[in-house]
């Protein structure tokens, strides 16, 4: 087994078999979502986000940090490739909470071809991310551990939607065109540096739970969800409380001496 797989499996506490099949893909997808938190801390500090294999491994795996889509799906793609899955990254346009005009391609997701079927995997869309792969099939409701999703085909584009309290809400749209590393670098740079990017203005964290719940942090507001409903909400009174939640609830390996956040 390669070093990255040893380190990654230790990171997500995985001791199962690693056969190239849909059961392995589902299990790794959920384990990843429940262990490696979505977070944008480096954008706010600010620290440049590097997308090369070594940087992603050192940050998300060795240093026990999280990241956003370019990092999360970058690591997951590498792991699947090391396991000999047929996988490649795609780029999508986020339409959730965006104006009607089409935004640039700033979301990284994965296409996995397995057992003569195509699957979409995505461990990097924050609180609404998939926690299981779904088939690349149009207008089929597909259940994951954290809710129902569907894909709609519109010409060459696909639109991913999630069921939000019985209302279908679009998340992002994408096509199956081949992308290059430079495309991910460009999307990452835009997401981290565009003045209106929400990653530049809000601290965002999410970790999914194996029982179908999830934990979120938006600035100093912490929420615990079960079955899509908030069962605990609290405003953190100070930076010390924020640091504690980062470590205790999100398992974030952060050197607090290197982080400076203003009091609320």
Predicted regions and their residues:
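Short Gly/charged-rich anion-binding patches and loops
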Residues: 4, 75, 241-242
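Residues at alpha-helix termini
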Residues: 11, 82, 248-249
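Acidic/His-leaning functional-site neighborhoods
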Residues: 154-251
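Secondary-structure boundary elements
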Residues: 1-64
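Residue-level detector of conserved catalytic or cofactor/ligand-binding positions
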Residues: 257-264
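Hydrophobic/aromatic-rich core segments of domains that either
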Residues: 74, 78-144, 148
């Amino acid at each position: 087994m390669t070093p990255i797989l040893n380190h990654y499996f230790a990171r997500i506490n995985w001791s199962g078999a690693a056969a190239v099949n849909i059961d392995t893909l589902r299990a790794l997808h959920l384990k990843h979502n429940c262990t490696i938190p979505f977070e944008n801390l480096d954008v706010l500090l600010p620290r440049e986000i590097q997308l090369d294999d070594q940087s992603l491994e050192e940050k998300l795996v060795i240093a026990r940090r999280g990241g956003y889509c370019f990092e999360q799906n970058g690591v997951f793609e590498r792991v699947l490739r090391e396991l000999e899955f047929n996988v490649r990254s795609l780029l999508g346009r986020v339409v959730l909470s965006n104006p009607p005009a089409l935004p640039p391609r700033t979301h990284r997701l994965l296409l996995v071809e397995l057992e003569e079927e195509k699957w979409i995997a995505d461990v990097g869309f924050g609180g609404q991310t998939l926690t299981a792969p779904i088939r690349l099939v149009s207008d089929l409701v597909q259940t994951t551990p954290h809710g129902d999703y569907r894909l709609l085909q519109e010409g060459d584009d696909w639109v991913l939607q999630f069921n939000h309290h019985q209302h279908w809400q679009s998340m992002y749209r994408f096509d199956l065109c081949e992308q290059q590393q430079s495309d991910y670098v460009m999307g990452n740079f835009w997401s981290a540096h565009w003045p209106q990017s929400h990653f530049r203005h809000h601290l965002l964290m999410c970790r999914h739970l194996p029982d179908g719940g999830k934990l979120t942090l938006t600035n100093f507001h912490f929420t615990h969800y079960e079955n899509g409903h908030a069962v605990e909400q609290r405003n953190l009174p100070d930076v010390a409380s924020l640091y504690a939640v980062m470590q205790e609830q999100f398992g974030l390996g952060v050197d607090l001496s290197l982080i400076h956040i203003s009091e609320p």
